[in-house]
Amino acid sequence: MPANATRKQIIDTADALFYAQGYAQTSFADIAAAVKISRGNFYYHFKTKDEILDAVIDKRLADREAMLASWDETAEDPAKRIACFIRIVIVNKAKIMAYGCPVGTLTSELAKLDHASKEKANQIMALFRDWLDRQFRELGCGSKSEDHALRVLGWSQGVATLAQAFKNEAYVQREVAEVLEWLNTVAEEVGPRRDA
């Protein structure tokens, strides 16, 4: 396998293991065994677990940037783009019910560990906040945009946490429906109704 392909496989595998097991609970040996490479080959690509973590955070950030960019391209107005973000808890509900939100769980774990990469991981939350803020501004919410963005972001993290704890799909569906209705109300306040 070419070196770049091996490196990518290590990052993808570490990403999945960090999500399912947590960063602290995942060892070099776990990742090497899952990738089926020797430790020597592993060390050729990454000397420390922190180097792998930084690569995983970079991957998650790039993946989320691509997701948001695709919504920017495919959803015709900001309310529909915000609705895409809201519905992500349904789209990913099986994984969320099993492991929680991949962004929220990682930022929380790194904060508890007071890990040097916690600020880098927080960039993903900041990406979501800033993107949502832009969508609400484009919708016409003005000075309320950041508050609305944080409300949606906080809501998504809360639903992900409770979905993981209680494994209740009906709850997730109800919460999504309620926050979409709230979004429609916000959109009505600034212009004609646009069902999200």
Placement of each model-derived feature along the sequence:
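Helix-turn-helix
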Residues: T6-Q9, T13-E51, A55
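Hydrophobic alpha-helical connector segments
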Residues: A55, A69-Y99, A149-V152
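Short, basic, alpha-helical segments at the C-terminal edge of helix-turn-helix-like DNA-binding modules
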Residues: D58-E65
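Hydrophobic/aromatic-rich alpha-helical bundle segments in the mid-to-C-terminal region
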Residues: V103, H115-A126, R137-A196
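Amphipathic alpha-helical segments used for helix-helix packing
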Residues: R81, K95-A116
